[in-house]
């Protein structure tokens, strides 16, 4: 949708985005196409956590952990749960790829392991900023 509306990156608009899936792909697109996430919050709806993003024109650089676990969620009360859910999904994907005999899948599994490591680091930062959960 944003690809078809490049004028939204010209600095005159604030966008409110709530990706239902693949939020990491949206964050990467935003970073690569002249958008910046000003604020990000998590919303729990029927047992599923969704990120909501306030996006403006601008430049931003996101780490691997931020691409997958959220750009501006350090103080969000759902942040820890959101990161854990991402880690579990990625670990399931890694387990599935482990049974593959295709060389490309080994590389994909290695990349997913790097993402899990980045998310674990991000989770520790979140816990340090917010204190351990009970």
Segments from the language model and where they lie:
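Class I S-adenosyl-L-methionine
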Residues: 1-134
């Amino acid at each position: 949708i944003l690809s078809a509306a490049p004028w939204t990156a010209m600095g005159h608009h604030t966008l409110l985005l709530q990706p239902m899936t693949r939020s990491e792909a949206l964050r990467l697109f935003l970073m690569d196409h002249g958008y910046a996430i000003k604020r990000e919050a998590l919303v729990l709806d029927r047992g599923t956590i969704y990120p909501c993003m306030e996006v403006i024109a601008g430049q931003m650089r996101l780490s691997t952990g931020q691409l997958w676990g959220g750009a501006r969620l350090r103080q969000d009360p759902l942040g820890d749960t959101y990161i854990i859910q991402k880690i579990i999904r990625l670990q399931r994907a890694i387990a599935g790829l482990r049974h593959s005999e295709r060389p490309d899948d080994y590389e994909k599994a290695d990349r997913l392991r790097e993402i899990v490591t980045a998310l674990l680091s991000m989770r520790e930062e979140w816990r340090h900023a917010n204190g351990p959960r009970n």
